């Protein structure tokens, strides 16, 4: 689905990511973890073609270039960390139809998609609600719904559990686990990563220091501490130094 080959990116003379090589297969759910400044957001921007570096990026067999950029972006949905930046129309319904209509779908087909996604997520009651009158958890779920309405093949999520209470956080986790799309989740919430991801890529200062089975990496206390992180909360107290 996505392949990076020796990808590097710098701001001026300051390298942000260096010689990254990895691939994500169709249907995988991958966690992208690392301390602040590790390069997580940069990788997502590179995948969306928002910035360009050196090396090769291929999405579903398409090289990342100007000619393919529009098609690549239609394949990838991006759930932002701050839902207020994603839900910019007056109502949930208006936000959900914005993408499909701009892709040229008919009003009837768009309506079917919206109703199908809302039913899939159990959010029918939000359809005509005003965005400023719904809770933070409802808005996060509505933001996911707007992306699903565009039927992407892959979904990028930036800190999807941030600022949610335990009930809404669990709702988001359960939703992520039900989605069939390929998913890349960048988060500091390692408990959520443990609950949702089969694989983890651990970054430090723009380089991959571990890439493998999620539970093995997230149980490795020394590895995490060496890279300025702690064990998932659910595992603390059960590991020996």
Across the structure, where does each feature detected by a protein language model lie?
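A short, surface-exposed alpha-helical micro-motif characterized by mixed small hydrophobic
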Residues: 193-195
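H-loop/switch region of ABC-family ATPase nucleotide-binding domains
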Residues: 187-188
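Conserved ABC ATPase "signature" region
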Residues: 108-126
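Conserved ABC transporter NBD signature motif
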Residues: 53-64, 72
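The feature captures the beta-strand-to-loop junction immediately N-terminal to the Walker
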Residues: 33-35
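Conserved beta-strand-loop-alpha-helix hinge in the C-terminal portion
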Residues: 207-230
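Catalytic Walker B motif of ABC-type/P-loop ATPase nucleotide-binding domains
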Residues: 155-158
């Amino acid at each position: 689905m996505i392949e990076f080959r020796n990808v590097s990116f710098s701001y001026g003379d300051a390298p942000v990511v260096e010689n990254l090589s990895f691939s994500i297969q169709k249907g995988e759910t991958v966690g992208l973890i690392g301390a602040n400044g590790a390069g997580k957001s940069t990788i997502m921007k590179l995948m969306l073609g928002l910035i360009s570096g050196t090396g090769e990026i291929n999405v579903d067999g398409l090289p990342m270039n100007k000619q393919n950029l529009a098609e690549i972006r239609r394949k990838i949905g991006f759930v932002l960390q701050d839902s207020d930046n994603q839900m910019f129309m007056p109502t949930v319904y208006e936000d959900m139809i914005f993408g499909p209509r701009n892709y040229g779908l008919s009003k009837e087909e768009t309506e079917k998609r919206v109703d199908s996604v809302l039913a899939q997520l159990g959010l029918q009651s939000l359809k005509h609600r005003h965005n400023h009158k719904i809770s933070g958890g409802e808005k996060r779920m509505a933001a996911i719904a707007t992306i699903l309405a565009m039927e992407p093949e892959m979904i990028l999520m930036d800190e999807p559990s941030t600022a949610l209470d335990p009930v809404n956080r669990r709702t988001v986790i359960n939703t992520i686990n039900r989605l069939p799309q390929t998913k890349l989740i960048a988060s500091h919430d390692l408990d959520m990563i443990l609950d949702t991801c089969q694989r983890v890529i651990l970054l430090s200062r723009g380089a991959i220091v571990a890439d493998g089975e999620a539970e093995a990496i997230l149980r490795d206390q020394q590895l995490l501490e060496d890279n300025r992180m702690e064990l998932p909360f659910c595992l603390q107290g059960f590991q020996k130094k």
